[in-house]
Amino acid sequence: MNMIMKTLALSFLMAQVLVSCMIENPENKLFDISGDEPVANYQVIGKVTDVKGNPIAGIRVIADYSTGMPYLADTLYTDKEGRFSKFMSIPRVDKFVMSFTDIDGNANGGYFESKFIEVNPVRTEMASGHFGGSFIVSAEVELNKK
């Protein structure tokens, strides 16, 4: 009998916990975590040079595609030709905030100032159904020495 009471009490507590964990949004609809937001393909590409046009290797490029809430970004690094490239499939966004930072100090041509720019994706393929389309995010950046 004691075991039956413990089982019933535990079941009652579990039901209370599950009900209290429900998250609702302002429209009084249950929070949607099913991933129904269309996903788009983005090809982030570009080149970083100094003011004389020489490529700069080892520059950290952060492609921030946050749309308000959680900070969402990908980190890339320039190669010996100053180029960076990354393919990503993410929910549809209208802009990327790109940052370019010299993280290796005097190596690769000296100390360079950081730079921040906004880039609007350019559509290369139309959306269809659950597919949000394809886009290119391109940036050619010159960095000044410090």
Predicted features and spans:
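Short, acidic Ser/Thr/Gly-rich low-complexity loop/linker segments typical of extracellular
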Residues: 69-83
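Beta-strand-rich domain onsets/edges
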Residues: 22-43, 47-52, 145
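Conserved "repeat-terminator" motif of extracellular CCP/Sushi domains
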Residues: 38, 132-146
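Sec-dependent bacterial lipoprotein signal peptides
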Residues: 1-21
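Short Pro-Gly-centered beta-turn/loop motif in secreted/extracellular proteins
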Residues: 85-97
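Structured interaction patches on ligand/partner-binding surfaces of diverse proteins
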Residues: 103-136
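Short, ordered, surface-exposed loop/turn motifs in non-cytosolic proteins
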Residues: 44, 50-69, 90
